[in-house]
């Protein structure tokens, strides 16, 4: 089997605080983010970090930086798109919706929008989704742990 080198690839990383590079103490940045190491690990690939702390995949009225709302600001010419998010949707009670939903105010509908929009704009690109990391819920904010119910009764 032939392995394709990713060293000449452009990779767009779209996410929340984990992508941004949050250190868990209110600071951080791209220099400590997993994205800053990815390019070197792949032999020099160009890696763009589009992480924003606290952002959600779905649209909610209290913020304007959801993945859906930020999609127009990302690179349409990337070879690979990595979408790493969902923990803020869970912790901030975004409804899941139903599979097949196109409502961008629900998690499933927002994911549908991301997939359709990215693949329409960049049909040659690979699309990778990373699921949120398990959380302990030990935080100064009222955020449930991964194994606790959120206010919608979901885990």
What residue spans do the PLM features occupy?
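A short helix->loop->beta-strand "cap" motif at the edges of active sites that frequently abuts
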Residues: 44, 121-127
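Generic structural signal for well-ordered alpha-helices
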Residues: 111-115, 150
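Conserved SGNH/GDSL esterase-like catalytic core that processes O-acyl groups on lipids
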Residues: 8-12, 18-109, 144-147
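Active-site phosphate/pyrophosphate- and oxyanion-stabilizing loops and adjacent acidic/basic residues
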Residues: 36-37, 116, 154
């Amino acid at each position: 089997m032939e392995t394709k080198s990713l060293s000449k690839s452009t990779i767009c990383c779209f996410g929340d605080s984990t992508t941004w590079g949050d250190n868990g103490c209110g600071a951080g940045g791209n220099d400590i983010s997993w994205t800053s190491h990815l390019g070197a690990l792949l032999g020099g690939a160009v890696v763009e970090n589009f992480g924003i702390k606290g952002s959600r995949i779905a649209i909610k009225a209290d913020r304007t930086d959801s993945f859906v709302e930020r999609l127009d600001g990302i690179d349409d010419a990337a070879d690979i798109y990595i979408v790493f998010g969902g923990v803020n949707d869970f912790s901030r009670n975004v409804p899941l919706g139903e599979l097949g939903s196109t409502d961008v105010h629900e998690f499933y509908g927002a994911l549908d929008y991301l997939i359709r929009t990215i693949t329409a704009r960049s049909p040659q690109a690979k699309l990778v989704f990373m699921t949120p990391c398990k959380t302990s819920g030990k935080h100064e904010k009222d955020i449930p742990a991964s194994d606790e119910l959120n206010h919608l009764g979901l885990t």
